[in-house]
Amino acid sequence: MIRTSFLAGALALLAATGASADESSKAAKVTLVYEHELPNVPGKSIKGVLVEYGPGGFSDGHTHPDTAFIYATVLEGAIRSQVNDGPVKVYHAGESFSEMPGDRHGVSANGSETKPARLLAVFVVDTKQKELTYPLKK
């Protein structure tokens, strides 16, 4: 149920951006892989999200809930990332980065046009929070 609503939200986000067929073929595949309430932190949950990029793949600019802390680890390949107005950085397999509550993620993309890339984003977020990603306002 959660996975279905998360994926439906991701698809709605993609549709709302007016992506062309070519752009949608480059869109990231996003899968909720786990979700657990934190027993020692009432009202908070930890959610793991696998983000898979094909060659040249990307996610549109986005933000997350104001209560979400995200810690991302690159599992395969290389990820280009820009948080807020900082520089675009490239993270390789085994490297990690974080996003603080309210941060804007302007660039999130595969660093390669020929190889896939994957990252695991771990969210600490309000348990009642269902949507994890919102498009950046243009």
What kind of region is each of these model predictions?
Residues 60-65, 83, 90, 108-111:
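Short histidine-centered beta-strand/loop micro-motifs
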Residues 17-23:
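Sec/Tat signal peptide C-region and signal peptidase I cleavage site
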Residues 5-16:
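Bacterial N-terminal signal peptides
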Residues 87-88, 102-129:
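Ligand-binding loop in jelly-roll beta-barrel domains
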Residues 130-138:
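Short, low-complexity, Pro/Ser/Thr/Gly-rich segments in the mature regions of secreted, periplasmic
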Residues 25-61, 67, 122:
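A short glycine-rich, His/Asp/Glu-containing loop-to-beta-strand
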Residues 67-86, 93-95:
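Glycine- and acidic-residue-biased ligand/ion/polar-headgroup-sensing regions
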Residues 38, 42-43, 52-54, 85-102:
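Short acidic-glycine-tyrosine-enriched beta hairpin
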